[in-house]
Amino acid sequence: MNKSNPAGSVTGSDIIDAKIEEHQLCGSKKCPSCGHKLEGKPQDWVGLPAGVKFDPTDQELIEHLEAKVLAKDFKSHPLIDEFIPTIEGEDGICYTHPEKLPGVTRDGLSRHFFHRPSKAYTTGTRKRRKIQTECDNNLQGSSSSGETRWHKTGKTRPVMVNGKQKGCKKILVLYTNFGKNRKPEKTNWVMHQYHLGTHEEEKEGELVVSKIFYQTQPRQCNWSSSTSSLNAIGGGGGEASSGGGGGEYHMRRDSGTTSGGSCSSSREIINVNPPNRSDEIGGVGGGVMAVAAAAAAVAAGLPSYAMDQLSFVPFMKSFDEVARRETPQTGHATCEDVMAEQHRHRHQPSSSTSHHMAHDHHHHHHQQQQQRHHAFNISQPTHPISTIISPSTSLHHASINILDDNPYHVHRILLPNENYQTQQQLRQEGEEEHNDGKMGGRSASGLEELIMGCTSSTTHHDVKDGSSSMGNQQEAEWLKYSTFWPAPDSSDNQDHHG
């Protein structure tokens, strides 16, 4: 290299080559780790194996810078200039486009440099960040395309080493098309600049270290903030707890240096607590049971009811607990009715729910009997004779209580009035044919005798004199044999002798 050239004609590449040559000649002959003496000439040394990359952290870069600046107190690594070369003069980073810097490519790998920022003007503290016009013209094609300069983004961040602030870090992005009435265009060139001290701005002439890379992928540094908001929504606004029942979802992300080193290597584990699984299963299970019960009711031919008339509260409780909450006189179909009807048609009860289904079956028949009882008392059609002779209400309820000995048997008196009258007429006609001679003197039909037998003693006195005591006896006899409705002998003898 010709060192007799004037200082103004020395380029940045010549300075770097001189530094590398000087380091090779004056380099250490010992291994910095074990102290082993290295034999052979520097040109005989082999390089590092393929795949080895120089990717120091922020703290490590500050330590290298501190060792470079404070050479008396800290000993710099003998090979540090091989990985972080120093650029001086007007060919520095603040003047040269990143593509013109030695070793910088667009493959996303980062390159590190020691350099000294310069002022934009002779007076003031503003730093020069404008790229040289000549380089800008060669890249853009014309001078009318605007200026190209580094623009700081974000705030200056402190760099902590062992709990103490050793330096500061600022991030700059390269923009093009700067100028009046122009809209700057952002490029993918990024620079991280580090300087020593606690002040946000570096001192004049101070040596700094910068990392430059071409960002090949969108930055993902804000990914953790978006996931923290998701954690606040899913986990109740705080850090996800590891206990409390229910599972935890673990999301792992390795940021690495996929964007060319824009994000430092780190791993983040975000725990998102989902809602209680039992509540979800209860709610979904209750809805599925409701749909299944409605489908079973339609298949069994049961009357359809609105969803608000069915009792599905709460979903997680068994059907017998729901039965205690329901009032049997409401007249609406409950969940037990639907399930019992489905059980009766399928005839395949589950072994785990046989006890509950038997209880529901008994409750279902009892409720059907009560509903029919209410329907008979309310909607019983009025007979013309009943408007003249109406039996007492107490007698009617007494007969029902006497006959209600079997809860699974529907008695004849609980059937509709039309079927009851038809059966009684057919039975009375058969008895009249069988006892034609015996019943020849009767002037009333069998149905009228039945109604007359259920009347009070005063009515019997009006029809036939002197039969008040006999009417009470007939009333007791009718209550005793009300299931078969035979004609009492006393009444036959009375009519025969009358």
Curated annotation (Swiss-Prot):
Residues 48-215 form the NAC domain. The keyword Nucleus applies. Residues 466-475 have a biased composition (Polar residues). Residues 166-221 bind DNA. It is found in: Nucleus. Expressed in the vascular cylinder of roots. Expressed in the differentiation zone of the root stele. Residues 256-266 have a biased composition (Low complexity). PROSITE patterns: NAC. Pfam families: NAM. Its main location: nucleus. Keywords: Activator, Cell wall biogenesis/degradation, Developmental protein, DNA-binding, Nucleus, Transcription, Transcription regulation. GO terms for molecular function: DNA-binding transcription factor activity; transcription cis-regulatory region binding. GO terms for biological process: cell wall organization; positive regulation of DNA-templated transcription; regulation of vegetative phase change; tracheary element differentiation. The keyword Cell wall biogenesis/degradation applies. Residues 356-374 have a biased composition (Basic residues). GO terms for cellular component: nucleus. Residues 225-278, 338-374, 423-443, 457-498 are annotated as: Disordered. Residues 233-248 have a biased composition (Gly residues). The NAC domain includes a DNA binding domain and a dimerization domain. PANTHER family: NAC DOMAIN-CONTAINING PROTEIN 73 (PTHR31079), NAC DOMAIN-CONTAINING PROTEIN 75 (PTHR31079:SF31). Transcription activator involved in xylem formation. Promotes the expression of the secondary wall-associated transcription factor MYB46. Functions upstream of NAC030/VND7, a master switch of xylem vessel differentiation. Acts as a upstream regulator of NAC101/VND6 and LBD30/ASL19. Overexpression of NAC075 induces the formation of ectopic xylem vessel-like elements. This is NAC domain-containing protein 75. It comes from Arabidopsis thaliana (Mouse-ear cress). The gene is NAC075.
